Amino acid sequence: MPEQLKQRVETCYQQAEAFFKRRFPRPEVSFKLRGQKAGVAHLHENLLRFNLQLYRENQEDFLRQTVAHEVAHLVAHQLFGDRIQAHGEEWQLIMRGVYELPPNRCHNYDVQRRAVTRYIYRCPCPQSDFPFTAQRHKLVHQGRRYLCKRCREVLVYSGETRVE
């Protein structure tokens, strides 16, 4: 499946080379991107990173729009240098002129949020649940103390967790 994506990167570069009548160095392509971003262009490393999960779930649009979007960042950087805005007129020129695509800044793919465990802390106040992140819960275990803003008592772990 990533072979189609790599082929689309190559096609985008060939289009840019035909349009600008010059060669561009090919980037390294990585699929080590997670979370909400569909793709990232690392300008100084000449590296493209893509979110394989979002690619699998939105293959057609991803190949057409997202790959061209990220390649356009590298091409714009190689043509115009560091002093351009990420989604500025130079990048937009490449999206419209070279790839004949709308210069959309963001994707609208459904992104699965990961489940997060919250650790419930309490104080003597009524209805005083304080959901702590795993990081804050760990800090409490290391000796950090948190106080209730109302009663100024130390918050105590209730032994309960909640998945959000």
Curated annotation (Swiss-Prot):
Chain residues that bind Zn(2+): H69, H73
Gene Ontology cellular component annotations, sorted alphabetically: cytoplasm
Chief localization: cytoplasm
Names of required cofactors: Zn(2+)
Matches recorded under InterPro entries: SprT-like_domain, Uncharacterised_SprT
Family, per entry: Belongs to the SprT family.
HAMAP family, sorted: SprT
Entry-linked PANTHER family: PROTEIN SPRT
Protein's recorded name: Protein SprT
Organism: Pseudomonas putida (strain ATCC 47054 / DSM 6125 / CFBP 8728 / NCIMB 11950 / KT2440)
